[in-house]
């Protein structure tokens, strides 16, 4: 992965996403791994969540523009699970947005990202779509692991993420493996 540009915008973007996710975790507690199909706020992406997510929306800077970010997030099994989406309205901004989302996740945990290509069924193919594995520390100093998937559909970017002190492979694989864009 090439060296990241200054991260002032991406850090703000991830802080907004992480803040919303942690707020949702405090507000929405449900049994661990009570799997359910959930559609993204725009109805285009489906995922299996192990808890009942709540919707949060916020405007933030991403890829040189201001977007409305819709985040569905919940806490289950000691992890925070989220699916965020934003419409950039301009396909030329997608690569930068995917890079910023991935870089911001890494910066938030002060972690070196391990990335691999990602293909979500039905998603618009994009070379910037990827899975990112992170291990580091949250701003409060607590150790954390995070798995992130960033991808596109049309002019929208999506970020699915799981954050926790420890991430069991099976539920994380179920969640990220369930992502699909609906026809």
Annotate the PLM regions:
Residues 25-28:
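C-terminal motif of bacterial Sec signal peptides marking the signal peptidase cleavage site
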Residues 30-32:
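Bacterial signal peptide processing site
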Residues 52-61, 65-71, 104-152:
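Signature of long, low-cysteine stretches enriched in small and polar/charged residues
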Residues 53-55, 97-113, 154-183:
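Surface-exposed amphipathic alpha-helical segments
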